[in-house]
Amino acid sequence: DGMDFARRIKELGYKVSINPINIMGYSDKDLLWIFEQVNAIHPWQFSIVDTFGSMRRRDLERIVSMADHNLAPDIRLALHLHENMALSFCLAQEFLDKHLRRDLAVDGSLMGMGRIPGNLPIELIADYMNETLGCHYDIDEMMDAIQDHIAPLKGETAWGYTPAYFLSARYNLHRDYAEHYLDKGDLTNRDINHILAGFDRSKATAYDKDYADRLYREYQNRAVDDTAA
């Protein structure tokens, strides 16, 4: 499994970061087990990965507190965020403001570039770190890179906050479900909200097209029945 692979890679002399996907899907008991396994491997870094962009401030507080109290103090703690709820910059600030007694890292991308809805805009958190933590990131260089290389790409392939991806995050579902229903072309955001609200939790993490289509047909049939009534 992933832990065994990380252990073997570390034994080869590489710096290892362990990044469990969808950390919001784990119970506190699961997280404690993960931290125990991570301590046994003792990697360079452990990353809190908000895979589905569903993390809120209270979730960050809980998970960071558990990680800080249970991970070995020399393991760096990192944060990887998505922009489903337009909270990535807020959460990154909260994380850095904790001033934990361990090394911290936050990753992002210029202009938040990434598969829609995108990631934390790295220029925002770099500027925040300059202002509050005494860092010296060159914002001019980032602005030049955005103008010359990233902005033209956004004209070809859009990313950023959209309501449908907020809804998938709201229910902590795989983002492909939102994309699937958007591609139908005949659903409003209200429709998508109602369909996603009815998802079985066992289908949340791994995208299941057949299941998504079944719920779509059931929803459409109910809509027809309501109209007839």
Model-derived regions, located:
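Catalytic cores and adjacent flexible loops of soluble metabolic enzymes
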Residues: D1-A229
